[in-house]
């Protein structure tokens, strides 16, 4: 084993400016310490939030930026205090790679809500080095922010790491895990299609809600949804009033909330998971008169991610993906912006030429 104190270099694909165009970029990895893993990246999913970051949609981007937070890799080296992982293990890591370890969320296994969390890219680590993501040959991650990938789950299924736990966590936290509930999925993209699969596996009746009819066959026949509702169909929306216990709103652009609040039963929950950098509006009687809630949820903890992966393994759930090489990544990002993917791009990093 080599020295864990030495710096290493790796090559990733980085955005240099808000154009969001990625190209090869060689940089130093942060020093690895006693609790760290040095990981060879095998594959990395592409999430819509990656587009927000590389194009500076949120006004917080720093360049050069190597995106990618749905990462599966092979452990090449472990620090002296690493206890859960060994060289050769297949592991996954996500969007959070650091936290304060002392606040309420950290002490209750909800580190993704720590106010001092460190993002896996477009942030600065405790040693002052910029963090960079999974569109790269290697990464260094602390053992607290890594999970073991179950045997039988393909490495390319790393999209489950983000999309899967984004729906699994709120279903568990909001007491919506029991069978027999009626749920809605607004938006049939990467998160939405996993929402259908996970909710169905929990025994829920699932309605997909979309702006057009073009995904009806896919939703009902391929993903197993029970019903399909077009939001512009006034009669259909009216008939569905007060019919759902919850709705996952995965839409990442500004849209009205009131039509969907009307679909919720008494005490129903509208759960926001799409990143929107603009105000959303509704009139208060829409929630008051049905004791309804508009809430949000952000990915899931590492503990919940482990639970979700085991749940997916047990139920045989996988993400529907399109595997690409790194030299196609810019085209894939353009297609993702147009919603032209079913339902998640995954980069075969280990099989790609990076330089």
UniProtKB/Swiss-Prot annotation:
NADP(+) binds at residues 49, 166, 187-192, 210-215, 250, 274, 297-299. Disulfide bonds: none annotated. This is Probable cinnamyl alcohol dehydrogenase. Pathway: Aromatic compound metabolism; phenylpropanoid biosynthesis. Its cofactor is Zn(2+). Involved in lignin biosynthesis. Catalyzes the final step specific for the production of lignin monomers. Catalyzes the NADPH-dependent reduction of coniferaldehyde, 5-hydroxyconiferaldehyde, sinapaldehyde, 4-coumaraldehyde and caffeyl aldehyde to their respective alcohols. Coiled coil: none annotated.
